[in-house]
UniProtKB/Swiss-Prot annotation:
Role, per record: Part of the dynactin complex that activates the molecular motor dynein for ultra-processive transport along microtubules. Together with dynein may be involved in spindle assembly and cytokinesis.
Keyword entries, A-Z: Acetylation, Cell cycle, Cell division, Centromere, Chromosome, Coiled coil, Cytoplasm, Cytoskeleton, Kinetochore, Mitosis
Protein name as annotated: Dynactin subunit 3
Quaternary organization: Subunit of dynactin, a multiprotein complex part of a tripartite complex with dynein and a adapter, such as BICDL1, BICD2 or HOOK3. The dynactin complex is built around ACTR1A/ACTB filament and consists of an actin-related filament composed of a shoulder domain, a pointed end and a barbed end. Its length is defined by its flexible shoulder domain. The soulder is composed of 2 DCTN1 subunits, 4 DCTN2 and 2 DCTN3. The 4 DCNT2 (via N-terminus) bind the ACTR1A filament and act as molecular rulers to determine the length. The pointed end is important for binding dynein-dynactin cargo adapters.
InterPro entries: DCTN3
Species for this entry: Bos taurus (Bovine)
Localisation per UniProt entry: Cytoplasm; Cytoplasm, Cytoskeleton, Microtubule organizing center, Centrosome; Chromosome, Centromere, Kinetochore; Cytoplasm, Cytoskeleton, Spindle
N-acetylalanine carried by residues: A2
Gene Ontology CC terms: centrosome; cleavage furrow; cytoplasm; dynactin complex; kinetochore; midbody; spindle
Keyword Hydrolase listed: no
Broad class of where this protein is predominantly found: cytoplasm
Coiled-coil boundaries: 135-157
Similarity remark: Belongs to the dynactin subunit 3 family.
UniProt-listed GO biological process terms: cytoskeleton-dependent cytokinesis
C-alpha cells in the first residue's frame, strides 16, 4: 500500500517537473521526461559497453566509493605490532594527556563547591553591576570632556587677564614716566 502511494507521489512529481520544463500547455509531442532519461541511460550503457576504458573507470569509481567510506578503515585489521608502534610513537603525548587528566580530576571537587554552584544567582547581580559600570564610564567621559572645556576656558581667561595686566602695567609705567618727566614747579 505504501509502495503504491510512493509511486503515485513520484509520478505526480514527474508530471509537475514536465509542466515546469514544457510549460502549462502540456508536453510537446507527447514526449515525457522519464522517456528521455531512459534513452540517455541506454545510450550511456551502450557507449560504456563498447569502451574498455569506461568499464575500468566504472570499476575504479566503485573502489573509490568503497575507500571513501569511513567504516572501511575500521574494517581493515592492523597487526598488533603496528598498533604497538603507534602507541610507542605517541607515548610522551599520552603521558602528558594523562597528567592533565589527573589534574582535572583533582579539580573536580572545586567544580562541585557551593561557590561555583551559586554562579547563576550572581549572574544577575553581575549584569546589573556591569550596566552601572558602563554608565559610570560614560559619565566619566562626559565629565572629562566638560573638565577639558572648563580648563580651556580658564586658560583663555587667564591669558586675557595676563594681557590686560601687562597693558595696564605698560600704561601705568608710561604715566609714571610722564609724571617724572614734568619739570617740578617750585
Amino acid at each position: 500500500m505504501a509502495a503504491v502511494t510512493d509511486v503515485q507521489r513520484l509520478q505526480a512529481r514527474v508530471e509537475e517537473l514536465e509542466r515546469w520544463v514544457y510549460g502549462p500547455g502540456g508536453s510537446r509531442g507527447s514526449r515525457k521526461v522519464a522517456d528521455g532519461l531512459v534513452k540517455v541511460q541506454v545510450a550511456l550503457g551502450n557507449i560504456a559497453s563498447k569502451r574498455e576504458r569506461v568499464k575500468v573507470l566504472y570499476k575504479k569509481i566503485e573502489d573509490l566509493i568503497k575507500y571513501l567510506d569511513p567504516e572501511y578503515i575500521d574494517r581493515i585489521a592492523l597487526p598488533d605490532a603496528s598498533k604497538l608502534q603507534f602507541i610507542l610513537a605517541e607515548e610522551q603525548f599520552i603521558l602528558s594527556q594523562v597528567a592533565l587528566l589527573e589534574q582535572v580530576e583533582a579539580l573536580v571537587p572545586m567544580l562541585d563547591s557551593t561557590h561555583i554552584k551559586a554562579v547563576p544567582e550572581h549572574a544577575a547581580r553581575l549584569q546589573r553591576l556591569a550596566q552601572i559600570h558602563i554608565q559610570q564610564q560614560d559619565q566619566c567621559v562626559e565629565i572629562t570632556e566638560e573638565s577639558k572645556a572648563l580648563l580651556e576656558e580658564y586658560n583663555k581667561t587667564t591669558m586675557l587677564l595676563s594681557k590686560q595686566f601687562v597693558q595696564w602695567d605698560e600704561l601705568l609705567c608710561q604715566l609714571e614716566a610722564a609724571k617724572q618727566v614734568k619739570p617740578v614747579e617750585e
